[in-house]
Amino acid sequence: MTEFGSSKLMEAVEFTGILSNRHQENPDFHNWNIVVIRYCDGASFAGDAEGEDQDGTKLFFRGLRIWEAVVDELMAKGMDTAKQALLTGCSAGSLAALLHCDNFRERFPQDVSIKCLSDAGFFIDEKDLSGERSLRTLINAIVHLQNVREALPKGCLANKDPTEVSSHISNSVLFVMFLNSLTDESLLQCFFPAELIKSINTPTFILNSDYDSWQIRNALAPNGSYPGQAWSSCKADIRNCSSTQMDILHGFRKKLVSELKVAEDKRDWGLFIDSCFTHCQSPFRISWISRISPRLGNKTIAEAVGDWYFGRREEVKYIDCKYPCNPTCSSHLPTA
């Protein structure tokens, strides 16, 4: 058991970056009430299933219930009177923010400003170096094992092809029948952000590197997808990549940027897509706002997110040029 599997083993977390209560480090959100929901369920707080392991051990996946219980408690403790709120997360937590964004919005009156921020969670369904879809295989296992259907936005599920049913059935019954007829493939598609964001109605900010270090290491070039140590040095530090390897990374970037077109076209959404070799930028001071923070349009991430959330600029959508064009990308940024 690890800290990800039990709250008994969780270690203390330092509140830095977007979580900081220091004005200098977090000028726009330093005086907000901040709650961190520690990641522990393995499916971005989406699962709701129980089953049996091969040895007869009972397995319970309750991420969705954990999410609902935490939000219920926060509402009871005063969040119900909030005038502004931001649901955010990084990596798997970023995917959770997307999955639950509209649900979070629905908890509040319409005159409350609710927005979402997704940091380093724009996972793409791309083939790895061997031609396999390693990330798809992993996510498919999660979708199947944890029964994530109830957490997926109904708008996304509604866009998938249902089993043909009689047209005279009422819409509510039709939708129930439709849900029951969805294939695992349909559920899998709605777990990937490229499909997921199409049905999110709440204003959302996508913060991501288009050379995301976690995806390059675990989805594009996972161990076993290449011979020997051919990619080890490149995966450790993008500055070590050969021109041939960079061509492959540029291809990864091209697909990620193309899938962000949906977000780019959405009114009230924001983008900060840098070309730094990093993963998770908002929770760390060095990335969020510091002397060596990545900058796009001469804005740090903190400034761009603040401009977007508080409407200081009409549009906040930055997409970087290809690596290594951005001189503000530092080798000291966090990777995973």
Give short role names for the model-derived ranges:
Residues 1-336:
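C-terminal His-loop and adjacent cap/lid subdomain of alpha/beta-hydrolase
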